[in-house]
Amino acid sequence: MSDNFEQAKSRVRQSEGAYVAMRPLVSSWEQRKLGELLLFQNGFNGSSESFGSGIPLISVMDVLDDKFITHETVRGKARLNCEEASRYCVEYGDVLFQRSSENQEDAGTSNVYLDQHVSSAFGGFVIRGKKVGEYNPIFIKYLLSSPFIREQITHRAQGAQHINVSQDTLADVALLMPSMREQEAVGLVFLYLDNLITLHQREPPHTMKEGKNANRYQ
């Protein structure tokens, strides 16, 4: 992830201020359905003895994390045979969705698997969108969290005690997709801003206060 962050900083600081100023994009954005980009499948359901050790198994907690998912960040583990490991495999660019939630607002929350070297598996309370179309994985994460997309998903989520999202609901979500070049540019800008905010949040309170006082007397 650090490589992506440094790449984002470099691009944001390029001459002409293309990404900083966010000048109007000149190419048209194409309307697509999410089902054209992803092939959906429910996750692994094993016996209680299957969990606790084995290969990394992506759960709802990983999907809800603010950071992208990688092999190292996955919290759970499960023992899967070779056929199961292949069937429930999660690879770079795949999108993971929360299948069931306790409230309407969180229904269908998504995250993206961003490990280019090692795969993982995913559990039964998660829907995997296997990457079958062309898109930038960083861009798609931010696009799927936009109000326009979230409203489509939550509006069609159903349930009483638990709010469920179906594969059909996800496949029918309408998207506006720019060119791959613009997807990369937009995605890296948001990635840079996210990392910048995170870095500032980690600063000790006294450091932030000193910085404000210094600016006051300049």
Task: Describe every region a protein language model picked out.
Residues 1-218:
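Feature detects amphipathic, helix-rich regulatory segments
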